[in-house]
Structures are given as structure tokens and as C-alpha cells.
Amino acid sequence: MSDIEQRVKQAVAEQLGIKAEEIKNEASFMDDLGADSLDLVELVMSFENDFDITIPDEDSNEITTVQSAIDYVTKKLG
């Protein structure tokens, strides 16, 4: 597991109150992990803080699964 993957899963676990080891990469934040729209906003803010990146609103709409978050952060960090 990459450092980015581990950190994304940890942020998701803390935000949604679930164990990081139970989070699958293909899991949808809303459908599989029970996140609501406020949780998604807070997750995006957490990713921004944890990785020192900026995620524009139009990009945040594309971050719907754990893997899409990992891919997005990886791309932003280049």
C-alpha cells in the first residue's frame, strides 16, 4: 500500500468513523461507506490539509470513491 493510499484511507476512517483496514479502494463514499454531502465536503478539506493541495469544487465532484481520491491526490502531487 502506498503512502498516499494509506493516508487517504486514514482520513476516510477518521471522518466516517470506520476502521481503515475495512476500507476498500473501490468503495463509494456515499453508497458503500455511508457518507453524506457534508462528509464529502469535510473529506475534501481533510485531503487538502493532509496533502497540502487545493481541490477546486469542480474537481471535488469527481472524487466519489476511495480510489478516485487516491488517484486525484497522486496526480496533484505529481
Swiss-Prot record:
Q: Which Pfam families match?
A: PP-binding
Q: Which InterPro entries match?
A: ACP (IPR003231), ACP-like_sf (IPR036736), PP-bd_ACP (IPR009081), Ppantetheine_attach_site (IPR006162)
Q: Which domain of life is it from?
A: Bacteria
Major subcellular site: cytoplasm
The record's subcellular locations are: Cytoplasm
Q: Which SUPFAM superfamilies match?
A: ACP-like
Q: Does the keyword Magnesium apply?
A: no
Checking PROSITE patterns in the record gives: CARRIER (PS50075), PHOSPHOPANTETHEINE (PS00012)
Entry GO MF terms: acyl binding; acyl carrier activity
PANTHER family under this entry? ACYL CARRIER PROTEIN, CARRIER DOMAIN-CONTAINING PROTEIN
Pathway entry: Lipid metabolism; fatty acid biosynthesis
An annotated GO cellular component:
membrane
State the protein's purpose: Carrier of the growing fatty acid chain in fatty acid biosynthesis.
Q: Can you give the residue ranges of the Carrier domain?
A: 2-77
Keywords attached to this Swiss-Prot or TrEMBL record, sorted alphabetically, are: Cytoplasm, Fatty acid biosynthesis, Fatty acid metabolism, Lipid biosynthesis, Lipid metabolism, Phosphopantetheine, Phosphoprotein
Describe the PTM. Answer: 4'-phosphopantetheine is transferred from CoA to a specific serine of apo-ACP by AcpS. This modification is essential for activity because fatty acids are bound in thioester linkage to the sulfhydryl of the prosthetic group.
NCBIfam families documented for this protein = acyl_carrier, PRK00982.1-2, PRK00982.1-3, PRK00982.1-4, PRK00982.1-5
**Which protein family is named in the record?**
Belongs to the acyl carrier protein (ACP) family.
As stated in the Swiss-Prot or TrEMBL entry, residues carrying the post-translational modification O-(pantetheine 4'-phosphoryl)serine are 37
Q: What is the lineage of its organism?
A: Bacteria, Pseudomonadati, Pseudomonadota, Gammaproteobacteria, Moraxellales
Quote the protein name from its UniProt record: Acyl carrier protein
Its BP terms in the Gene Ontology are: lipid A biosynthetic process
